[in-house]
Amino acid sequence: MKKLFGLLSVVLVAVICFAQPVDAAKKEKRAKYVFYFIGDGMGINQVNGTEMYLAERAGKIGVEPLNFTTFPVRNFVTTYSAYNSVTCSAAAGTALATGEKTKNGTIAMDKEHKAPVYSIATKAKELGMKVGIATNNSIDHATPACFYAHQPDRNMTYEIATDLPKAGFDFYAGAGFVKPEKKDSVNIYTLFDRAGYTIARGNDDFRKKAAKADKIIFMQEQGCDMGSLPYAIDRKPGDLSLEEITQGAIDFLSKDKKNGFFVMIECGLIDWACHSNDAAAMFNEVIDFQKSIQKAIDFYKQHPDETLIVVTADHETGNFALGTGKYELNLKALQHQMVSKGQLSKKISALRTTHHYAVTWEDVKKLLSDNLGLWTKEELKESYEKDLRHRYDKAFSNGEQEMVKSLYAEDEPLANTAVQILNRIARISWGSGGHSAGYVPLFVLGVGAENFNGKLDNTDIPRQIEALMRDIQ
């Protein structure tokens, strides 16, 4: 009995001795480098559909995993706002940034509009971390704004921009600013200059200026659309990409690694494509988004014990459905779409202008064949061709065109109908041009990833990130 007691004592002492260093090691691990990726409008079906689309393109049934869907933690998240079952990007952005529910349309203020609520980006700054905010929309758009601004209405874009230097973060990037001036007010670029920000326009300009800049705002070149970068499907050589912005953020924020960094990177064009019910543009945005995420994964491989990567979405857009009744999909048909619906619309408008309405049906068929693969790559039902011919007759009569409006676009009816038909051929459908209350996905890799298991609300995510960032100094 004494021998047994003695043996148990030795085992107990050994367990205690070995347990202490392990616990200490766990306590030492903090999220020194935090990547927070938000796919605006990227619901579960947007992700699953992209993977199935990639699989079909490779000649198989099933999924071709995206890099972030292989992360060890895969979860789903609720998105309702303070007063609505269906959120807007401002309220969802506030929840993801601050951990607080608010009223739809509100940028990082409480639901009564009485006080500001502060983002984990602000808290990271207080911890001495470098901070970056990036998007492929305008920098004053709802999601990025929720991390640095406090305004009662997301449409107050000038006021949102004036909050940027007040936050004092190190790196901002995106298309630009949609309202740099306001009557009887100071131009926002003057405010940025006074606050010590370097303005870089285009990737080459950024590379020239970044090394010497203390704080920087990285935008598209002069003359480009300040509302958004081009869709991935429309991108031309020399166009700025979210991947380049992401690499720029990593390089700039890594100049001083003493206290680490926090960076939020939004792919806002997933949402825009979904508002337009443009499946091919949306799939291409998700595929392009993973290129940005790969930059973070590459960084993680160099700092595996100090890096946290979180990928999620603010809400689902479009009530996107995979399947239209028949038990099959034909997603590979979407690979024949060469441009976004918006660019197709511009091509149709240009055809009308250059030909002064003297456009033949054969001219239109060639345009739709070249850009969507209709007739040449995908056979058309008689009813589909009839619909297109009807739209052609209206589009090229001398009557006034009534454009098809979505939240961020106005498109030619012929372009809208043609893309709808290609979607039907692919056997996917859209329930609306707005948001839905559907779950959004969550994928996590790195330090503390296990803390994101279990059903979560969007407000849980920033709270957990903050907990993992604490005490890194």
List PLM regions with ranges.
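Residue-level recognition of conserved structural "scaffold" positions that shape functional pockets
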Residues: 13, 46-50, 100, 106, ...
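Short, motif-level signal for alpha-helix interfacial/capping segments enriched in acidic residues
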Residues: 18-21, 25-26, 291-294, 298
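Bacterial Sec-dependent N-terminal signal peptides
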Residues: 1-25
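A post-motif C-terminal structural segment
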Residues: 31-33, 42-47, 52-94, 144-145, ...
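Short glycine-rich loop/turn motifs that provide flexible caps or phosphate-binding loops at active sites
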Residues: 38-42, 98, 131, 437
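Active-site-adjacent structural elements in enzyme catalytic domains
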Residues: 29-36, 41, 45-46, 51, ...
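Extracytoplasmic mature domains of secreted/periplasmic and thylakoid-lumen proteins
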Residues: 93-169, 176
